[in-house]
Amino acid sequence: CMRIRRVERKVENRMANWVSAGCGVIANELAQAMEKRGQKLYGVVNRTPEKAVAFAEKYGVQKVFTSFQDVCADPAVDIIYISTPHNTHIHFLRKALAAGKHVLCEKSITLNSEELEEAVQLAKEHGVVLAEAMTIYHMPIYKELKKRMDAGKFGELRVIQMNFGSYKEYDMKNRFF
């Protein structure tokens, strides 16, 4: 179990600058969620530049990066959101963490425990936050379940098997349909 410690980083009286690495379905959800809070992504980078430009235009993103290296080199970037395919995560994590950027990475954060240990170590070495985008921890049902487990309502637990599903609007463009 990875514990994420809070690391404070001074951002001079401004909102943190987020960059999305990837601009697929889940990155669109992040951009929409930020819009609802009156915020915008600072930048976007994608392996297909045309998609990055379209994403930036759609969400009013200030900067389109042409490479991930450029993202890491930009001192204005505070947090990188990684929503690329799973097998690419460690590649981007290594670069972002070594550059001193905070990272929120989609699940699964890495392909194996060795990659995860490496990423955690890099985050510690560079004093930045590394987090996996696990939303279930914040859902009311899981908070209630944890409360009941801690209170011993289920007796001594040896094994827990859980399934989770959520309703999604039908969308033929979504790979899950």
Describe the residue ranges of each PLM region.
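Hydrophobic residues in well-ordered beta-strands that form the structural core
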Residues: 20, 65, 105, 130-132, ...
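Predominantly a Rossmann-like dinucleotide-binding segment in NAD(P)-dependent oxidoreductases
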Residues: 136-177
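Rossmann-fold dehydrogenase core element
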Residues: 118-135, 155-159
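N-terminal Rossmann-like dinucleotide-binding module
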Residues: 11-59
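Short, conserved SAM-binding/catalytic segment
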Residues: 55-61, 122-125
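Beta-loop-alpha module in the N-terminal Rossmann-like domain of NAD(P)-dependent dehydrogenases
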Residues: 30, 62-120
